[in-house]
C-alpha cells in the first residue's frame, strides 16, 4: 500500500491552482472537468512528479461538513497538512517575498523546525525541516 493522492479542501480551484503552482512551486499533474464547478485537479512536487498528488478538492463549496471542518481547523490555528522542506529559513524568506502570510514564523520544536502559513484557499499549511 502507498499514498497516491491526498485531498486538500479549497474554496476556489482556480485560485488554489495559481497559489500552489506559482507561489509554492508545485506542478499541475491532472486537470479533468467533472461538472460546471468541479474538476479532478491535482498538483505534485516539481522534484517528484511521479510522487504523491495533492487533489485540490472544492468540497467546502458543496459539502457543508467539509466547510465546517476546514473553518474549525483554521480558526483553531491547526494546519490542514504539512510539507517538508530542506531549508525552512530559505523557503520562509522566499514565500514572504511572494506575499505569503505566516501565522507562525520559523520555530524550533525538538527535532524539527516549523512554520505555518495561510494558503489563501481556506487552510493553514505547516512547513517542516527535519534537523
Can you say where each PLM-predicted feature lies in the sequence?
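Conserved active-site tyrosine of GNAT-family acetyltransferases
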Residues: 16-21, 95, 122
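Conserved beta-strand-loop-alpha-helix junction that forms the acyl-donor binding cleft
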Residues: 10-13
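Vicinal oxygen chelate
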Residues: 1-5, 27-83, 92-118, 129-131
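Conserved catalytic-loop position in the HRD/HxD motif
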Residues: 87
Amino acid at each position: 500500500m502507498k499514498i497516491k493522492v491526498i485531498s486538500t479542501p479549497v474554496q476556489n480551484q482556480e485560485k488554489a491552482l495559481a497559489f500552489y503552482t506559482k507561489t509554492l512551486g508545485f506542478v499541475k499533474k491532472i486537470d479533468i472537468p467533472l461538472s460546471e464547478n468541479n474538476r479532478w485537479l491535482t498538483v505534485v512536487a516539481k522534484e517528484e512528479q511521479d510522487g504523491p498528488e495533492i487533489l485540490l478538492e472544492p468540497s467546502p463549496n458543496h459539502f457543508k461538513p467539509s466547510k465546517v471542518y476546514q473553518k474549525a481547523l483554521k480558526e483553531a490555528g491547526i494546519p490542514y497538512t504539512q510539507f517538508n522542506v530542506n531549508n525552512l529559513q530559505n523557503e520562509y524568506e522566499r514565500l514572504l517575498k511572494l506575499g505569503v502570510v505566516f501565522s507562525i514564523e520559523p520555530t524550533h520544536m525538538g527535532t524539527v523546525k516549523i512554520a505555518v502559513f495561510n494558503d489563501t484557499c481556506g487552510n493553514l499549511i505547516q512547513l517542516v525541516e527535519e534537523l
